[in-house]
Amino acid sequence: MNISALAVSGVLLLFAQTSFSAGMEKSSQTIMPFLESGNYAELGIAQLKADISGQVQNQDSLAQIGISDFSTGNLVNKNYLFITGAIKLQLRPDLSVGFLFDKPFGTDLDYRYRPETVIGPLDIESVRVKFDSNNISIPVGYQPDAHWNFFAGPVLQTLKGEVELGGQNYYLLNGYTSDLKQDFSMGWLAGLSYQIPEIAFRTSLSYRSPVKHTFDVQEQLPIATPVTLTGKTTVKTPQSVNFDIQTAVSTTDLIYASLRWVEWKDFYVQPPTFQEVLNAYSVYDSSLKNVSMIQYNQNQLSAKAGLIHKWNSDWSTAHELSWDSGTDDSLSTLNPSNGYLGIGGGLIYHYNEKIFLAAGLHYIRFRKASRQKSTDSNVIASLSKAANNHAIIYGFKTGFHF
């Protein structure tokens, strides 16, 4: 087959590692760089520009005090950056080790609804939620022959977060803040891969364990004299399964696909003082018992499929379709969408047989989340309507064998 492994890597590794999926997922946590032949290194950077908005609730009441603009404005940081890197070393013909870096989980929501009223600007509602993670996976692989690769290894992960709530819509939680100090914890991964190099065929199945973080959390209560309380809270990032497959269909064309499952249903963020305040006031409003800061109703399933065409020894192009199921959560500022459909394209330049440069662009159209269901737990900052939200991801990646 004339289609080279570098042509495959250029686009697969560019799109596979950048994501704007369900929950807080920001990476597909692919194992693909580790499956490259020989010694290999890569570095990638991508940026997301999102336009995500909706309309607030209680519009009739707001109109009575002269408010006519019910739009939330853009709910997310317009310039979300993705960084990935990998080094894979073939220590012996039958033994390899990899170091894979990504930022798999995170969110950057900064929303403030402060419309003009008959008495001037009024703080109705504001939400600031920011989570950030760093992940280093260290798979060690055993290759008994040219086809099989069995691998496992530790996953080192840090996670931190902050939440701020404000505005009259929050009543007793107006002014609440929570700071989850950065925590380091460990998980593990394992999997296997089968390949037939002569026809560029490769398939892999990998599993990542959940990672349990125990945070030192600092919460500030919105009372006459602000009180800061410290405590502990636990957050478990989700376990996941990835399946990837690719094969050449001619001397110049290769098709590929991937499927990913993530267990978001067991993920939640509920600091202790936040819960205690809700419990205390639930005597007056029983619905407060079910309020969750961050929680997801369903697990996530996502898929990608694409075609790579090799034009000559220097240039290849790719086209890709993507789909994400979402987590079926109610419409809110924290969940303005429920999955997406996407389409992308990429261009790969082969500097020589060992080095490639790749650039790509991916357009995402988000599906609208539904308004709150009676079976859901109450959510923070519910919305009455979602806009036609979308995002664009563009990125660059370089890789080389050595």
Please place each PLM-identified region on the residue numbering.
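Outer-membrane beta-barrel porins/channels
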Residues: A22-E25, S53-V56, D60-Q64, F82, ...
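N-terminal, post-signal peptide beta-strand-biased segments of exported outer-membrane/organellar beta-barrel
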Residues: N2-V11, F15-K103, D108-Y111
